C-alpha cells in the first residue's frame, strides 16, 4: 500500500479542515469519502476534492472496502460508537477529542483494543505536534531550568457556544492542557482542584475557570480557562523551574509600532494558531499507518505513534475529577486503571 485512503466522518469546521489539509499538504494520503448527518454539507465538501464521494452514513464509510483509515470529527456523543466500529472493522482511526463522552466509555475502547491485540486508535491531541510545545518539552527534559516546579497556562477564546455548561468547558477545552502538560513534565496527574470567580452576570456557566493539577512529585499546573474573553484566541504557557523559566513564544508574525502604540494581531479561533500542529499530526498518523502496513517490527503494537486510547482515557478521568471538584468545592484525587500492557510499549 503506497497511499492511505482516508474517510472523514463529520464535515463541520474540524472535519472540513482535515479534508483540506490532507488534500493539500499530506503526502501518501487521499480523502476518498466523507459522511455527515447533513448530507448536503457532506456532498459539498466531497465535490471540492477530486476522487472523493459523500457516503450515506458513518457506518457505510467505516465498512467501505475503499477506505483504509478513518478520521472521526463528528459530534462528541458519536466518538465512542464510531471508534468502536472502526476497531471492529480493523481500521486505524484518528478520533478528535474527546475519545468518548465518559471515562467509562473510554474504558470500553481500551478493552476493545486489548481484545483485538492492536492499538488502532489515535486521539487528536494536536498540541503534542505543535513546534512550541515540542521544544518546551525538550528543554524541560534537558534540565536547563533545573527541576520543573510549576506551570502557568492560559487558554482563552473569543466566545463560547451558547449551550455550553461549566462542565463542557472542562470536558471539551481544558482537556488540551490536561493532556499536554503531563506530557511536557513527564509526570502523571494525581490530584486536581477547580475554582471560579463569582460571575458578574450569573448564567448557564462559570467562566472564567481555574484548574489546578498536582503531578507526581508535587509539581503544580495552573490553568486559566476563559471561553468568552472577547478580544481574541490566545494560548500561553510558562514553566517555572529551580534555575529559570521557559515559555511559549508569541506566535504573531508581525508587530506594529505607531501612534505611541505597539500592536499584534490575534486569531479569532484555534485554527491559525495550531495549523502546523494539525499538519504534523496528520502526516505522522499517515506515516505510522504506512509503517505498520509494511510490517515494521518497531511498530508491532499498531499504527499509532502519537497519543493513543490510553491517553484519551486518562484525559477523561482527569476531566471528570475536575468536574467532581466543581461540585464538591475541594480537591479530588485522580483514580484510574493501571495501564494495560498493550499501552506500555513505546510510551515516552
Feature names for model-found ranges:
Residues 124-132, 157-193, 206-207, 311:
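Mid-domain beta-loop-alpha active-site segment that forms a flexible
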Residues 1-49:
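N-terminal Rossmann-like dinucleotide-binding module
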Residues 17, 37, 230, 270-283, ...:
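Active-site loop of classical SDR/Rossmann-like NAD(P)-dependent oxidoreductases
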Residues 18, 49-112, 346:
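Beta-loop-alpha module in the N-terminal Rossmann-like domain of NAD(P)-dependent dehydrogenases
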Residues 77, 100-160:
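A contiguous active-site-proximal alpha/beta segment in oxidoreductase catalytic domains
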Residues 56, 95, 101, 121-123, ...:
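Hydrophobic residues in well-ordered beta-strands that form the structural core
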Residues 172-254, 279-296, 339-348:
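Contiguous beta-strand/loop segments that form the cofactor/metal-binding neighborhood of enzyme cores
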Residues 1, 69-71, 288-348:
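C-terminal helix-rich "cap/oligomerization" subdomain common to oxidoreductases
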